Amino acid sequence: MEKLKILVVDDESRMRKLVKDFLEREGHTIIEAVDGMEAMDIFYENKDISLIILDVMMPRMDGWQVCREVRALSQVPIIMLTARGEE
């Protein structure tokens, strides 16, 4: 399996850790961001990101905004996540 540089974006530290631990065990390099604004800063600085795993609901800049901004610049694959369930 190809080793990837993956940006994991989630305001919940437990979710970031869960995703990071799993992917690092597979040999991937993980970069973490706590919100959309930090994710965009990291994305601009790292042109070799292979995948973005992105929470939908975050403060400052949500996942949809990040997705639109990234899509305007790149075709990097994006996986959108949410922990929100039906009540």
Locations of regions flagged by a protein language model:
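Acidic catalytic/metal-coordinating carboxylates
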Residues: D35-E38, D62-Q65
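Active-site beta3 strand of CheY-like receiver
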Residues: K47-I53
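Active-site residues of response regulator receiver
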Residues: D55, T82
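Charged docking surfaces used in two-component/phosphorelay signaling
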Residues: K17-R25
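Receiver (REC) domain active-site loop signature in two-component systems and cognate sites
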Residues: M58
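Conserved sequence signature across two-component system core domains
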Residues: V9-D10, A33, I52
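Conserved phosphotransfer cores of two-component systems
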Residues: Y44-K47, E69-V76
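Short hydrophobic/Thr-rich beta-strand motif most characteristic of the beta2 strand and flanking loop
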Residues: G27-V34, I42
